[in-house]
From Swiss-Prot:
Gene: eif2b
Subunit structure comment from the entry: Heterotrimer composed of an alpha, a beta and a gamma chain.
Protein name: Translation initiation factor 2 subunit beta
GO molecular function: translation initiation factor activity
Job description of the protein: eIF-2 functions in the early steps of protein synthesis by forming a ternary complex with GTP and initiator tRNA.
Matching InterPro entries: IF2/IF5, TIF2_bsu_arc, Transl_init_fac_IF2/IF5_dom, Transl_init_fac_IF2/IF5_N, Transl_init_fac_IF2/IF5_Zn-bd
Length: 142
């Protein structure tokens, strides 16, 4: 009863798993961080000074993020250069909460938690496609 058992070396298994990762995930060594919104209230307007920087950190179209924020706070607004201008007075706390909600719904993969995602359209439906695990999750259309 002397069967030969072939145990895999952990390091070899780890190397094999690493080789299977997509190229864009292999080279992602930094922690995912979104810069905090720099909110200024001027009269009856709220200005998010670093709006485009935030959208770029999330790897999303600034217009998509703006559309979400405007719907969430029920107001009108525009993009001017690298900043967003909203009609009305909104606290930095409220803006930060809406950014977190956007991250949860349209950026972070609900399957593996990776921020390496993109929004794709198949027919009439929109999906959040994860570059790390390959999951496709249906999302609401804005």
């Amino acid at each position: 009863m002397s069967e030969k058992v072939d145990f895999y070396d952990f390091e070899k298994l780890l190397d094999k798993a690493y080789e299977e990762l997509p190229e864009n995930v292999k080279h992602h060594h930094s922690r995912f961080e979104v810069p905090p919104a720099q909110v200024t209230i001027a009269g009856n307007r709220t200005i998010i000074e670093n709006f485009v920087d935030i959208a770029e950190a999330m790897n999303r179209d600034p217009n998509h993020l703006l559309k979400f924020i405007l719907r969430e706070v029920a107001t009108a607004g525009t993009l001017e250069g690298r900043r967003a201008i909203l009609q009305g007075r909104f606290t930095p706390y409220l803006i930060a909460n809406k950014m977190k909600k956007y991250l949860k719904e349209f950026v972070i993969c609900p399957v593996c938690g990776s921020p390496d995602t993109k929004i794709i359209k198949k027919g009439r439906f929109h999906f959040l496609k994860c570059e790390a695990c390959g999951a496709e999750t249906p999302i609401q259309h804005l």
